[in-house]
Amino acid sequence: MDHGRLMDDQMMLGSQVYPYTTQPQNSHCIIVNQIDGGEESKPVKRRRKRRSKGSSATNEEDVAEIGGMLRKRKLTDEQVNMLEYSFGNEHKLESGRKEKIAGELGLDPRQVAVWFQNRRARWKNKKLEEEYAKLKNHHDNVVLGQCQLESQILKLTEQLSEAQSEIRKLSERLEEMPTNSSSSSLSVEANNAPTDFELAPETNYNIPFYMLDNNYLQSMEYWDGLYV
């Protein structure tokens, strides 16, 4: 009995010091309000933290800053023309030049840097497109020239085949012809050939005497002396 009363006194003291205790129920822990007598087990709800006034003001400032940056991104035509002119002179943007351009145009240096970065990217893409167009045009010309060469090769191959066929036909005809007939035909053609040096029998050839020189007369006398 004394031991049980001692345990009750300790529990009563603990409930006064710790008003909320946990009691196991169906293998789950439930927070019990000891001050209310523990008649009903009510789970404790967590309260959401309220934002302080300073934090809300900070968020509003962030939104305003973002809106200001968005407004700064809208450039006028004059600013765009000046930036294009500066980019045409020099594609790279150094820190001193960036500050100078930003001061002249009334822009933020970061905005100028971002504009130059985007402009360089567009410029590089354009250069790549131009280089690709040149290479594609060169490739198309090479392919066209190759097709023309292949067509010429086919024509020349056909002509060569026809020439070889004619050569074979001529060789076969020469092999079929006998040698005697060829020699007789050649002799007949030689006999029938006209002779330009044959003299007509009834023609008188009178050579003037005065055309004969002394050497010719001396030779004639020499030959006449031999036959006397």
UniProtKB/Swiss-Prot annotation:
Listed A to Z, the keywords are: DNA-binding, Homeobox, Nucleus, Stress response, Transcription, Transcription regulation
Per the UniProt entry, what is one GO biological process? root development
InterPro entries membership: HD, HDZip_class_I_plant, Homeobox_CS, Homeodomain-like_sf, HTH_motif
Please list where the region (Leucine-zipper) is annotated: 128-156
> Residue spans with biased composition (Basic residues)?
44-53
Q: Annotated region Disordered: where?
A: 36-62
Q: Does the keyword DNA-binding apply?
A: yes
Note the SMART domains from the entry.
HOX (SM00389)
- What subcellular compartments does it reside in? Nucleus
Nucleus keyword on record: yes
**Domain of life where this protein originates:** Eukaryota
Instruction: Name the DNA-binding segment ranges.
Output: 68-127
In which tissues does this protein get expressed? Expressed in root meristem, late flowers and siliques.
Query: What PROSITE patterns does this protein's entry cite?
Result: HOMEOBOX_1, HOMEOBOX_2
Expression induction per the record is: By abscisic acid (ABA), by salt stress, by indole-3-acetic acid (IAA) and during darkness conditions. Down-regulated by cytokinin.
List, alphabetically, the GO terms of the cellular component aspect. nucleus
Instruction: Show the PANTHER family listed in the entry.
Output: HOMEOBOX-LEUCINE ZIPPER PROTEIN, HOMEOBOX-LEUCINE ZIPPER PROTEIN ATHB-53
Tell me, in a sentence or two, what this protein's role is: Probable transcription factor that may play a regulatory role in auxin/cytokinin signaling during root development.
Name of this chain's protein: Homeobox-leucine zipper protein ATHB-53
Origin species: Arabidopsis thaliana
